[in-house]
Amino acid sequence: MSAPSTSTVVRVPFTELQSLLQAIFQRHGCSEAVARVLAHNCASAQRDGAHSHGVFRMPGYVSTLASGWVDGQATPQVSDVAAGYVRVDAAGGFAQPALAAARELLVAKARSAGIAVLAIHNSHHFAALWPDVEPFAEEGLVALSVVNSMTCVVPHGARKPLFGTNPIAFAAPCAEHDPIVFDMATSAMAHGDVQIAARAGQQLPEGMGVDADGQPTTDPKAILEGGALLPFGGHKGSALSMMVELLAAALTGGHFSWEFDWSGHPGAKTPWTGQLIIVINPGKAEGERFAQRSRELVEHMQAVGLTRMPGERRYREREVAEEEGVAVTEQELQGLKELLG
C-alpha cells in the first residue's frame, strides 16, 4: 500500500470525492451508470489508503477513454449459463459495471447451489480488486477473484516478461469483526506502486524488478522503461501468476496478458483481459459457524504475536476518513479539477 505524495494533504468528504470523480468520468465519455460504479471504486481505494489505485489512476482512465481503447458507454451482456455459472461479455467496457450487472444473479446462485462462478471477458480492469470481493463477505459469503493485466512480469527462470501483475483478492466474513480481506499482486510489487516511486524519485527495495537488459535494479524508471517486474517469492509467485492467466483469461474467454495490442490507441492504459469471481455460501456447510471459526482463527493469529491482520490498515484508514474526510493532496485535488475542466 503506497503513501500519498509529500504535497500538503487535505481532507475531502467521501461523498464529495465520489461525486467529483463521477463527474470526471461522465465528462470524458462514461455513461452515468458506468461513472457511478468506477467513481465509487476509485474513491474507496483512496479512502482506504490504497493510493496507487485511488485518484492516482484518474489521468490513466481519462487518457484511455480519450484514446477510444475502452467503451465508457458499454452495456454488459449477462448470460445465465448454468446452475452455478454466470458469464458476462463486458462489451469492451470496464469490468466493475459488468460485475454490478451480474451481481444479483451471482449471489442468488451461490446461495442456492452453495457456490457460483462469474466469468467476465472483453473487459478492462484498472482498479483495486478488493472492492470487488469485500461486499460479498459483508453479506456472509466467501469470495475469491482473479484478474490478469498487461505483460510486465518476467516468469521465474525466464528471460523476458510475459505475465501481468495478476492480482488475487479474497474476502470472508468474520464474527464480530470486519471481513477478512486481502488483495495482492502476484508480482513482487504492484505496477502502480512502481509508478508512484518513479514519480517521487524513490528507489525500490531489491528483488522487485529488472532493467531492459534483464539485470536486477532498484530504479523504478528502469523497470517501467523497458524493464519488468519479478514475481513475488520466485517460482511460487510465478506459478500463481500462471494460474491467474488460466482462470481469468483462458477460462473466461478473455485475452491473455500478452494478447492485446494497444499501440494504435496512444494514451491507453487499461488491460483488455478477463476476470473470474468465485462466490461460496458457507451456510451450505458450516452455517453460522463459519464466521465464528473465522473469528477463532483471527484470535489465534493475534495470540501468537500477529499485530496486524491482512486488510487491517485499510480499515483503520477508512475509520479515520469517515471522521475526518478522505486524504488527498492539494496537487491531486487540483489535478482532478483540471480533469473536470
From Swiss-Prot:
Keywords from the named record: NADP, Oxidoreductase
Temperature-activity profile: Optimum temperature is 35 degrees Celsius. Is inactivated at a rate of about a 30% decrease in 30 minutes at 35 degrees Celsius. The enzyme keeps its full activity, however, at 30 degrees Celsius for at least 30 minutes.
Active site: S52, H53, D193
Null mutant phenotype: Cells lacking this gene loss their ability to grow on D-lysine and also on D-proline as a sole carbon source. Moreover, the mutant strain grows only slowly in the medium containing L-lysine as a sole carbon source in contrast to the wild-type strain. No difference is evident between the two strains in other media containing as a sole carbon source L-pipecolate, L-proline, and the following D-amino acids: D-alanine, D-valine, D-leucine, D-isoleucine, D-serine, D-threonine, D-aspartate, D-glutamate, D-glutamine, D-arginine, and D-phenylalanine.
Keyword Disulfide bond carried by entry: no
Catalysed transformations (reactions): L-pipecolate + NADP(+) = Delta(1)-piperideine-2-carboxylate + NADPH + H(+); L-proline + NADP(+) = 1-pyrroline-2-carboxylate + NADPH + H(+); N-methyl-L-alanine + NADP(+) + H2O = methylamine + pyruvate + NADPH + H(+)
Coiled coil: none
Enzyme superclass (EC): oxidoreductase
Superkingdom assignment: Bacteria
Entries under Gene3D superfamilies matching the protein: 1.10.1530.10, Hypothetical oxidoreductase yiak, domain 2
Binding residues for NADP(+): 125-129, 183-185, 235-236, 308-314
Residues annotated to bind substrate: R57, T165, H191, G192
Activity regulation: Is inhibited by the substrate analog pyrrole-2-carboxylate, but not by N-formylphenylalanine.
One MF annotation (Gene Ontology) recorded for this entry: N-methylalanine dehydrogenase activity
EC number: 1.5.1.21, 1.4.1.17
The keyword Nucleotide-binding belongs to this UniProt entry's keyword annotation: no
Function: Catalyzes the reduction of both Delta(1)-pyrroline-2-carboxylate (Pyr2C) and Delta(1)-piperideine-2-carboxylate (Pip2C) to L-proline and L-pipecolate, respectively, using NADPH as the electron donor. Can use NADH instead of NADPH, although with much less efficiency. Plays an essential role in the catabolism of D-proline and D-lysine, which allows P.putida to grow on each of these amino-acids as a sole carbon source; D-lysine appears to be catabolized only through the pipecolate pathway. Can also catalyze the reverse oxidation reactions, albeit at a much lower rate.
Record-linked PANTHER family: MALATE DEHYDROGENASE, OXIDOREDUCTASE-RELATED
Subunit comment: Homodimer.
Family: Belongs to the LDH2/MDH2 oxidoreductase family.
Name of the molecule in the record: Delta(1)-pyrroline-2-carboxylate/Delta(1)-piperideine-2-carboxylate reductase
